[in-house]
């Protein structure tokens, strides 16, 4: 009986699918769960196909928005808003209050999460009159407003379409601004809403944190005792939002955000695959990723992170100033780029002349040592 000849391409595809299933089972990820996430999560075209790319390693820009609206621009339910303790739905704007660059090497070595202080005074790109100076967090909102104004002048658009196109302009501007500031490629992006932090903590049944001192803050609603404690969803959001009453203000808040992520990863690791369905539901409603990201490949890369192989670092600032009544961070762009280059491209850096020493930040601007993702760190 003649042997059936299967086209090589089909063999390759079939083999890849089988290998994928085996790997995902080994990683504790159900194929149905992956399919649900891959088909349900929102996608963005903010990163152009011809944009600069990393070689081998991957850089992912994570943006956390302040908006109190959902992905369609609709107000969140009143019950959720009251739990957020973040004011009415028209507050918050579209600032990217959380900016973090995830660098995942392709050799299995330690990954890094670089927090970019939101008030860094830098050149904004992708906004009217660019490049103009402003807080790095503002690129998203400025571009969104300008694009919606331009579209309205061209004719009627539905509110949902305006929201989508405005946000796409905001994402492009924020990515371009961070790319220019750090001088590294941005391969992928992930955007998380304010409510996303709340729903994430809820899906995990609370998040354990540790604070060095008891804190109470009426602005964020944070009310914590000293030491380790498990926070519900509302308390967890207050924990990552608080900056008033903290010695280093925004820098301490940045460290809290890092500690929150480390704790979330610690709990996901502990819960295993049982946590996945709830997390997928949260992602589908509160997360936007770029079209080019392959979630299966990303999940495999991220398996290193949930194993504790991730270090957090906050990029340096020089000092703070007050301009027009607002506090801004003055930064040395060349110094920041040297710090980033040492993490993102160490082999290339070693072949060049040694970089100049990076002066320490002022004492009042220096946070404690950064957390790692294999424990629950104590923070201020």
Regions found by a protein language model. Give the residues of each.
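Non-catalytic, solvent-exposed segments at the cell envelope interface
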Residues: 2-380
């Amino acid at each position: 009986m003649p042997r059936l000849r299967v086209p090589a391409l089909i063999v390759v595809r079939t083999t890849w699918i089988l290998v994928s299933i085996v790997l995902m089972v080994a990683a504790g990820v159900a194929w149905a769960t992956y399919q649900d996430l891959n088909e349900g999560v929102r996608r963005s075209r903010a990163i152009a196909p011809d944009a600069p790319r990393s070689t081998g390693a991957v850089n992912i820009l994570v943006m956390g928005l302040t908006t109190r609206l959902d992905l369609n621009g609709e107000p969140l339910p009143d019950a959720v808003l009251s739990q957020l303790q973040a004011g009415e739905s028209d507050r918050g704007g579209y600032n990217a209050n959380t900016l973090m660059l995830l660098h995942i090497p392709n050799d299995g070595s330690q990954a890094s999460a670089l927090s970019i202080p939101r008030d860094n005074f830098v050149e904004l790109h992708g906004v009217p009159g660019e490049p103009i100076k402003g807080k790095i967090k503002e690129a998203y909102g400025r571009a969104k407003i300008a694009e919606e104004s331009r579209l309205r002048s061209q004719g009627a658009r539905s509110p949902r379409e305006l929201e989508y196109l405005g946000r796409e302009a905001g994402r492009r501007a924020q990515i371009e601004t961070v790319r220019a500031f750090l001088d590294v490629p941005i391969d992928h992006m992930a955007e998380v809403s304010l409510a996303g932090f709340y729903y994430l903590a809820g899906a995990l049944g609370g998040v354990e944190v540790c604070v060095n001192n008891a804190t109470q803050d009426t602005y964020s609603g944070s009310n914590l005792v000293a030491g380790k404690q498990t926070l519900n969803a509302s308390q967890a959001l207050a924990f990552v939002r608080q900056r008033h009453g903290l010695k280093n203000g925004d820098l301490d808040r940045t460290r809290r955000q890092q500690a929150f992520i480390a704790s979330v990863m610690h709990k996901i690791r502990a819960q295993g695959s049982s946590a996945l369905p709830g997390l997928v539901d949260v992602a589908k409603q509160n997360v936007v990723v770029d079209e080019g990201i392959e979630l299966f490949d990303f999940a495999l890369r991220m398996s290193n992170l949930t194993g504790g192989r991730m270090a957090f670092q906050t990029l340096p600032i020089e000092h703070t100033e007050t301009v027009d009544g607002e506090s801004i961070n003055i930064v040395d762009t060349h110094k920041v780029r040297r710090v980033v280059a040492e993490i993102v491209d160490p082999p290339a850096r070693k072949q060049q002349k040694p970089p100049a020493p990076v002066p320490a930040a002022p004492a009042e601007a220096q946070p404690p040592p950064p957390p790692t993702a294999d424990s629950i760190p104590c923070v201020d």
